[in-house]
Amino acid sequence: GEGHLTALDVDAIEMAKTEERLRNQGFGPDILTVRKINFANIDEVAEKDGKFDFILADLGVSSMQIDNPDRGFSYKYDGPLDLRLDQTKGEPASERLKHVTRDEFEGMLIENSDEPYAAEIASVVMQELKKGHPVDTTSKLRELIEKALVRVPAADRKEAVKKSCARTFQALRIDVNSEFEVLETFLQKLPDVLNPGGRVAVLTFHSGEDRLVKKSFKENVKAGIYSEAAKDVIRPSAEECRCNS
């Protein structure tokens, strides 16, 4: 018989667009349910809709979110330094920065994105905040990252700044949205929401997510909860990367 797709997201803005697109393609209420809920609460969804035969978790952010300047996900566009996936909850990144110490911010950059210039970036950003100057736009944060990397040789600086900007925005986004904690909660609840013989696939974007997923799957195979876990990751082809760039 026909399956039923339950789609979860915390981003009401993108969720509405995606639902409209799917409905226009013929996905009616009989085969598609859309819920605004964090996948950390997948147990609540399973209680309402029943357990799942297959779960696909697509982590991180989409190009639609990144390309919207009002969301503040990208250093490439000027906009408010927000970075929240759900703009109805929590505090934006600009507020979060006011409530962390230099050491905490440095730790965040190292743990969430392996930023090699974490100490320099944290120092410059915190100096700016101590002066009473707000760091509330994406362009302002980018400007401070450029300042922090002033000692990088001129020939390498442009590329280094670009990479450090991407890593810094990633680290802040992970922190603002508690992404690692949310992922760990989701992974812990998975065995209880899957039907016997159910399968799970997780699309990870960076090593921090990848480590958590591998650890959880490995532990559950060892405990006899999962029958097996893929030994190798499936990487996107060059063609897929080109289409998504």
What are these regions (language model features)?
Residues 1-245:
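S-adenosyl-L-methionine-dependent methyltransferase catalytic core, i.e., the SAM/SAH-binding region
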